Amino acid sequence: MRVFLRIWLLLPGRLRLSTYNKLLEFGRRLYRHGRSAEVHRLPFGLYLRHGSGLDSTRNEFNALKLVRQHTSVPVPEPLDLIGLPPYPNDPFKEDHAYLLTTRLPGTPLAYCEDMLSDRDFEHVAAQMKDYLAQLRTIPKTVNPDMAICNVSGECCIDPRLSGWNPVGPFPDEAAFSQLMRFPDDPARRGHKIVFSHGDLNPRNILVDRFVRPDGSRGWRVTGIVDWETAGFYPRVLGLYESDVRGIPVDQAIQQAGENNFQCTRRLLKGAAN
């Protein structure tokens, strides 16, 4: 497989692109709907993301390689990245890209959270706590002059702060905090800068059934996907990742203690500490 991939990547991008488009057409008929309008399941255990901007797609490609290199966090393997010129009707004239990855088993947690018991949530939260700890150990080797940046040391794309508009990079947390409400709050200083997924929420966490040692069935994390916003951020911001709408951390943790659990807050309580 590795030898074939090396040979395949030597072929012209136009030929590879044509093949991916044919697989995309076949996959749409075979699997109907993907996780989003931009992400599609293909035959042969593959997924294809297309239509996203080249910069964010390249960032995801590099993030996946980085996570696979430094951690045991289950993420897709990035196989190919092809950059393309802007669509003719794109008013922003932004380059876009095709990203080919392997497929991970499982279903987004957001689609099956009602099937998980309290015991299942405890297990999933424990896994996520371990994975987040591993991600925070990934070394930053890019752009030493800018502490807060994407995987390549360039602009960040953070839907929590600026929609999908690129911002930064930033030399320190004080400069980064100017994007937020109350930017001069002393609480927005002194946090460790760590590697972060950037958009971690139940839609991007895959879970699947498994058999426990005692013979009972439960749920476990089988993958984390959608890494296009990954980068190096203040650690405190990672607490918001479990809710892309940016509910304050103290409020989220308080809500996690109520009987009427919501999936996001249950995970945040167990995994974000």
Regions picked out by a protein language model, each given a short descriptive name:
Residues 63-65, 203-209:
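Short, well-ordered amphipathic alpha-helices
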Residues 106, 203, 230:
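Active-site loop signature of alpha/beta-hydrolase-fold enzymes
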Residues 57-61, 125-128, 132, 202, ...:
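A structural signal for well-ordered alpha-helical scaffolds and beta->alpha junctions
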Residues 1-36:
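Juxta-kinase regulatory segment immediately upstream of eukaryotic protein kinase catalytic domains
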Residues 83-89, 121-128, 134-199, 208-219:
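An alpha-helical support segment within catalytic cores of ATP-dependent transferases
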Residues 28-151, 155-158:
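ATP-binding pocket architecture of kinase catalytic cores
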Residues 194-195, 208-273:
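Active-site Asp-x-Gly
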Residues 60, 197-199, 204, 226:
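Acidic active-site catalytic centers that drive phospho-/nucleotidyl reactions
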